[in-house]
Regions:
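Pepsin/retropepsin-fold aspartyl endopeptidases
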Residues: 1-172
């Protein structure tokens, strides 16, 4: 085991991580050996639910298909290509990201968060596109990898584009 720090969204800011290896991991019929893992230590306190374990098939070299309607994930070394409604290039550097445009001209990388409920931008991106903080903020309860982000708020009237996907006058 070795130790490192990670910066994430939330009250804690920098958080300790232990880098380790799982000797064996079984997921249904799939058996994996020597799986690299992160141990979040110390655990977060005063959060509404216990932190969940996470798995990244991409970090193990697998492709994946997520079917939300069937509540099913399929992953493997070689999957048949399925035609999607939209296709765009992914970048994988620790997190999976796609390139997007904010308010017509500002390029930004967005983390692909399959469990996310909103599209979010950073405060730096909001400043770069000239959006001022509204006088009256709609506070959000955002939970990041380092706990609650008490400064998060909803910013209305932002236009977003991801390849052929467009959202105009959208709250982020």
């Amino acid at each position: 085991i070795t130790y490192t720090l990670s910066a994430g969204v939330g009250d804690v800011g920098l958080r300790g991580l232990q880098l380790a290896r799982i000797n064996s991991l079984e997921l249904g019929p799939l058996k994996l050996r020597n799986v690299p893992c992160l141990i979040k230590d110390p655990p977060l306190r005063d959060i509404p639910t216990r932190e969940m374990e996470s798995l990244s098939p991409l970090s193990l070299g697998f492709s994946m298909i997520i079917d939300y309607r069937a509540k099913k994930i399929t992953f493997g070394k070689h999957l048949n290509m399925e035609k999607g409604d939209y296709e765009m290039p992914l970048r994988l550097h620790r997190l999976v990201t796609v390139r997007g445009t904010v308010d017509g001209s500002h390029q930004a990388n967005f983390v692909v968060d399959t469990g996310g409920e909103v599209i979010s931008i950073s405060r730096a991106t909001a400043v770069a596109i000239g959006k001022e903080e509204p006088a009256r903020k709609i506070q959000l309860r955002v939970y990041g990898s380092s706990g609650w982000d008490r400064d998060a708020f909803l910013l209305p009237g932002v236009s977003l584009a991801f390849s052929d996907i467009r959202y105009t006058n959208f709250p982020v």
